[in-house]
């Protein structure tokens, strides 16, 4: 993890509010795997957010609230406040998102595995690697971010997830497409970059690959790996 993120997590560790949340997302994955740079922090809670407490936290840390552009549409469509599901802040230049999954499956996964969480700082608990991987896989099917694509490749390569789980969630989220077809249709939305530091495990592999060529490279590698593993699983 970036040293700035470690410092911020240490600051958070003095606040008991974080006992209600679990560290997940790309940075939590990088904590386990050291596979790439991740620039933000995600905390999940398997119940609706306590927005007044989060606002108090932001004031305490002099953090800047990041409004969600979809908040008005969400309220019109659901009659609810998006802040009960997701709130984002800028803490010392680092984006920190607190969220309650608006998805029964994700909520069930967090509730299923939260007793297996591990304390990495006082009041800061990280969910198991397998749980974070499962949540990442679901996120991959819902958006088009190159970091997610890369993460799925790493998780499959390291056998943290398998083709059976991928196929199950592909059928759930992309009913009409096989996973190789999902990969082929993938197009990065350009909102994030895929970056590495020399100490990251995949730094050497990607060092000579230009940023604009990395998506195609990962898609090819992931497709080959998935097809190979799926064939092995059917034997």
Kindly label every feature range from the protein language model.
Residues 1-235:
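Compositionally biased terminal segments of proteins
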